[in-house]
């Protein structure tokens, strides 16, 4: 029997309250998409610069914070978990005032 492959990103969900006051989970990517839709709709034709960096910082900072908590501050484990080298992790932690 073949086992169905799970996409690890499917576990990244956000709990939301629907119109019937029920809590449901939706993929993180849907929440990011909605946040961007809201942001872009408020621009009213204005040009925007560095949107990529803005969005990345909004996701990267809390991700680093949670991974460092999960690994109890072990940078080697955190870097492995994130799939980056330890030097890169240290730079990112410094960037966000976390290291």
From Swiss-Prot:
Please indicate which superkingdom the organism of origin belongs to: Bacteria
Q: Which UniProt keywords apply?
A: Activator, DNA-binding, Transcription, Transcription regulation
Disulfide bonds, paired cysteine numbers: none
Q: Name one Pfam family in it.
A: HTH_8
Query: Which regions of the protein are recorded as binding DNA?
Result: 75-94
Matching SUPFAM superfamilies: Homeodomain-like
Biological process (GO) annotations? positive regulation of DNA-templated transcription
* Molecular function terms from GO: DNA-binding transcription factor activity; sequence-specific DNA binding
What the entry lists under NCBIfam families is as follows: PRK00430.1
Quaternary structure, per UniProt, is: Homodimer.
Family, similarity comment: Belongs to the transcriptional regulatory Fis family.
Q: What does this protein do?
A: Activates ribosomal RNA transcription. Plays a direct role in upstream activation of rRNA promoters.
What name does UniProt use for this protein?
A: DNA-binding protein Fis
Q: Which lineage ranks, top first, belong to the organism behind this chain?
A: Bacteria, Pseudomonadati, Pseudomonadota, Gammaproteobacteria, Pasteurellales
